[in-house]
Amino acid sequence: RNVDHTIKCIELAYALGIPTIRVNTGRWGTSKSFDDLMAKKGIEPRLEGYTDEDGFGWVQEGFEKCLPAAERCGVVMGLENHWGLGRTAAGVLRVINEIDSPWLRATLDTGNFLEDQYAQYEQLAPEAVLVQAKTYYGGGTWYTLEIDYDRVAEILRRANYRGYISLEFEGKEDHQTAVPKSLELLRRAFNA
């Protein structure tokens, strides 16, 4: 089902002229709720009887089924660091490196590394085709990260990143004031 959905999204992206889509590794589905998952910093118990090795195998198998559509359409799948097996740069890079295709790269979400964030940005930046820059004005719903966007911009410059920077606002402040502040913050950092 997820493979079919991803292929449909690749085809829709092609029809709309969108060069990349965000994909993720999925989760084990063992948390009671997303709130519970966030309380555990995105770490979720495995399904009983299965290992991370099983999970990585399923992820690889799924993406390999999507590769022909991505190549045919010229749409890159950007694997986001987003919980589950993709919670760390090492997990995302393991999938990317094992598949070893120009049609599977990374979507770097600055708000999804809850530990050693700058070291993980540095690891993932060379594979990034899209960056989702999170801001938390007014405090975040589940957590708030202090992100030094001047430092992030420097990491991306060193990796020769030339793609889009997408704002992802997750704060509680009214969007009418927070989004302009967020855009100004990002413009200052990335135009330096």
Outline where the language-model segments fall:
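Histidine-acidic metal/acid-base catalytic patches
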Residues: G17-T20, E64, R72, G86-A192
